């Protein structure tokens, strides 16, 4: 039997392209660094880094960015058996910069991303049964 995840996170997951220079708008950013992102996915990684068993449920596109996200989550110690590769929708992308006033500037790419197509009937119910705590990024069902 697999180990019992203590905390299960459900929600959006995306690739952030973060400006390599702060104080620049997206228009003026010279380059971007590819990072795993999405608040619920970040929570799952943080839980794992604190040494607590962590699992994640969500959708990614069946594309290179989706595979990148699963690899990053695995590397962080998050159980990823709850991630579904959606063959019909792409992984969400976000471009992020930190403006001079300290506020973040976002631009999202993908009008109908995979993470918005999480269906209750297609999720890994075993993860739900094994979780002590479940956190939701937003309401999907």
Where on the chain are the PLM-derived regions?
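Glycine-rich phosphate/adenosyl-contacting loop at the front of the ribokinase-like
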Residues: 1-79, 118-120, 135
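Conserved N-terminal subdomain of the carbohydrate kinase-like
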Residues: 53-138
């Amino acid at each position: 039997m697999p180990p019992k995840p203590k905390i299960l996170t459900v929600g959006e997951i995306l690739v952030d392209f973060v400006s390599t220079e702060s104080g620049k708008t997206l228009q003026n950013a010279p380059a971007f660094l590819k990072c795993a992102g999405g608040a619920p996915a970040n929570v799952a990684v943080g839980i794992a880094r604190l040494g607590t068993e962590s699992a994640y449920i969500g959708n990614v596109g069946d594309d290179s960015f989706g595979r990148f996200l699963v690899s990053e989550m695995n590397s962080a110690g998050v159980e990823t058996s709850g991630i579904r590769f959606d063959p019909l929708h792409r992984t969400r992308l976000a471009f992020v910069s930190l403006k001079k006033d300290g506020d973040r500037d976002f631009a999202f790419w993908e009008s109908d991303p995979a993470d918005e197509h999480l269906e209750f009937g297609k999720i890994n119910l075993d993860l739900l049964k094994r979780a002590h705590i479940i956190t939701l990024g937003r309401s999907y069902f």
